[in-house]
């Protein structure tokens, strides 16, 4: 593992190099795509990127949890959580990278 993190700037730079848009246009394109994805998730829609995976929002009901330090029961409120399910192609690709 390299420990490197792919950032918005890295994505913009890749669009700039690969597509040929200006740096400004590349940055705006990346921001717009991320905004569309975020908006869809906030609205409860799934975001499916072929050969990559599916982002979705799951609703979790209220439940009783436990404080691990004290053992005391604490209520956990209902909430929405973001989930990502990688595609089989992505899983295979990551697994193949583990072998090298």
Swiss-Prot record:
InterPro entries recorded for this chain?
Answer: Hist_DNA-bd, Histone-like_DNA-bd_CS, IHF-like_DNA-bd_dom_sf, IHF_alpha
> Its family?
Belongs to the bacterial histone-like protein family.
Name the residues that span the membrane: none
Complexes and interactors: Heterodimer of an alpha and a beta chain.
Question: Pfam families per the record?
Answer: Bac_DNA_binding
Gene encoding this polypeptide? ihfA
Purpose of the protein: This protein is one of the two subunits of integration host factor, a specific DNA-binding protein that functions in genetic recombination as well as in transcriptional and translational control.
Q: Which GO terms describe its molecular function?
A: DNA binding; structural constituent of chromatin
The scientific name of the source species is Jannaschia sp. (strain CCS1)
Q: What is this protein called?
A: Integration host factor subunit alpha
> Any idea which UniProt keywords this protein has?
DNA recombination, DNA-binding, Transcription, Transcription regulation, Translation regulation
Q: Which PANTHER family match?
A: DNA-BINDING PROTEIN HU, INTEGRATION HOST FACTOR SUBUNIT ALPHA
A GO biological-process term: positive regulation of metabolic process
Q: Which GO terms describe its cellular component?
A: cytosol
The record's CDD domains line, in alphabetical order, gives: IHF_A
